[in-house]
Amino acid sequence: MSNISNEAVILIKDVKPGSKNLNIVFIVLEIGRVTKTKDGHEVRSCRVADKSGSIAISVWDELGSLIQPGDIIRLTRGYASIWKGCLTLYTGRGGDLQKIGEFCMVYSEVPNFSEPNPELLAQANQQNKTSKEQRGNSPPNQNAGNGTVPVFSNNNAAPVPRDPNFGASGRPNGRAPGNGPPPVTAGGTPAPPKPTVSISNGRDPRRASKR
């Protein structure tokens, strides 16, 4: 309880779309019909109020079944969002609802801050559009400018030195860059050098045979 008492409590009139960590004390005026989600959860939309006005709050599952009109409740760590054009309170994952009393509270039903407000809906749509445009425009310009030039220049230059290097390093005679048939000459050279060596050395045995 000490942590809750130290947290600042705001009025319903100060709630804005996108607000988080809201701490509000209100009285329950009405409890709406129960609707079920696809996952089997029960959702109740309740109308609550304080001295500054009224607002709708969406309560899920067991908490909604325990709330009764006239209960004074403290909302902790709630948040606000626009649903179907209406400002609505939610408990959130870390939020909590605690009953602190009954009936004895000064409140005002007017103004109803959950009435459909086209201005709030338009502002939310504009914020979403601007954020998407800022995210969508910046990356393609950078990628298009940086990606085209270096890719083509590097690909054209790379294959030129690779072909002569692989052809020259394969055999010792490949250092002559302009010879088209180095493999043929390399394959034919081993036969002639052997008889040349034998012929040069064969002069002595011929003279010996004549003698």
Curated annotation (Swiss-Prot):
Q: Tell me, what does this protein do in biology? A: Component of the SOSS complex, a multiprotein complex that functions downstream of the MRN complex to promote DNA repair and G2/M checkpoint. In the SOSS complex, acts as a sensor of single-stranded DNA that binds to single-stranded DNA. The SOSS complex associates with DNA lesions and influences diverse endpoints in the cellular DNA damage response including cell-cycle checkpoint activation, recombinational repair and maintenance of genomic stability. Required for efficient homologous recombination-dependent repair of double-strand breaks (DSBs).
Signal sequence bounds? none
Per the record, where are the segments of Pro residues compositional bias? 179-195
Q: Where found in the cell?
A: Nucleus
Q: What InterPro entries does the entry give?
A: NA-bd_OB-fold, SOSS-B
> Which residue windows does the record flag with biased composition (Polar residues)?
136-157
GO CC term (a single one) = SOSS complex
Q: Name one GO molecular function term.
A: single-stranded DNA binding
Q: Which residues bind DNA?
A: 27-97
Q: Supply the source organism's classification.
A: Eukaryota, Metazoa, Chordata, Craniata, Vertebrata
Q: Which gene encodes it?
A: nabp1
Name under which the protein is recorded:
SOSS complex subunit B2
Keywords attached to this Swiss-Prot or TrEMBL record, sorted alphabetically, are: DNA damage, DNA repair, DNA-binding, Nucleus
Where does this protein come from, organism-wise? Danio rerio (Zebrafish)
The record lists the membrane-crossing segments as none
Q: Which family does it belong to?
A: Belongs to the SOSS-B family. SOSS-B2 subfamily.
Which GO biological-process labels does this protein carry? Answer: DNA damage response; DNA repair; double-strand break repair via homologous recombination; mitotic G2/M transition checkpoint; response to ionizing radiation
Q: State how it assembles.
A: Component of the SOSS complex, composed of soss-b (soss-b1/nabp2 or soss-b2/nabp1), soss-a/ints3 and soss-c/inip. SOSS complexes containing soss-b1/nabp2 are more abundant than complexes containing soss-b2/nabp1.
Where does the record place the region Disordered? 125-211
**What SUPFAM superfamilies does the record point to?**
Nucleic acid-binding proteins
CDD domains with a match to the protein in the record: SoSSB_OBF
Entry superkingdom: Eukaryota
